[in-house]
Amino acid sequence: MSTPQETQNQPEVDANVSEAGDGDSAFDAERFRSRAESTASITSSILEYRTIRGRTYQTSKTTEYWYRILDVGTGTGIWAIDIADKFPGAEVIGTDISPTQPSWVPPNLVFHIDDAQLDWTFEPESFDFIHVRYMQGAIDDWPKFYSQIFKFLKPGGWFQHMEPDIELRCDNPDVKVDDKHIFKRWAQLFYDAGDKLGRTFKFADGSMDKWASDSGFPQVTHKKFSIPYGGWSKDDNLKALGNYTGYYLDLSLDGFAVYPIGQVLGWTLEEVQVLVAQMRSAVHDPKNLTAGDMHLVYGQKPKST
């Protein structure tokens, strides 16, 4: 098991943001709305795949590609679209249980409506690269999931898996964060819900490394990145990243909490809304310098198995 390689540095704070009285200035929301609102709905022909015994079966293309890439849990398909644009000679497949992908996509990209927890129906050893991210709380059996990654990679193929640490932190040393702080309480509630569901939200404990190693990957690399939430950093790149992550989190907090905390832990809607409001306020508070860790694990299947 590898030790995470740290990439954290002491944050430099943009005074214009950190001294603002309204944390909203840390989130440049208008920049991202146009792209979100332009997302088209998925075509009816793709939706029809659900009627085939609840499974998706895609007709194989006859064109030969140099690379074959699988994006598991593709969501809106944004990563798959970007990678298909960047590598037009590759065949890219995105899978997700929900039909939230757009209809306008590069010609070398297809989406399958599929449940990644079931046995995958692709040809074994048929992908050069398998990409996974943001699947926290979505998988019952991670060892099985990783064994499928290994099974469907070609010899010499690579996988990459990225998950955020659900416990955010304050990068301001003057802010006290104890067990009563909303960042700690928020994370613990998700840990409790995950334990009850049998679907973990914990990815900072080296579990991804172990799953990969146990499935057959001989050498696994684990990198940990610190990312800001909000535009408080003085570094231009981190400021832009913080605006993206802050906006994404701002839109997602309600959706994150309703099922695991409301349905699984039995909180009322009003209680969940209060919790979300507290979390949103803390993330927006410029004094907190809100940040979090992103865990990236990757490895290569042996060229001969």
Model-identified regions with their sequence ranges:
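N-terminal auxiliary segments of SAM/dcSAM-dependent transferases
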Residues: 2-67
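Class I SAM-dependent methyltransferase SAM/SAH-binding core
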Residues: 69-124, 129, 144
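Short SAM/SAH-binding signature in class I
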Residues: 126-134, 160
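Conserved catalytic/acceptor-binding region of the Class I
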Residues: 137, 158-252
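Short N-terminal helix/helix-N-cap motif within the alpha/beta-hydrolase-1
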Residues: 139-141
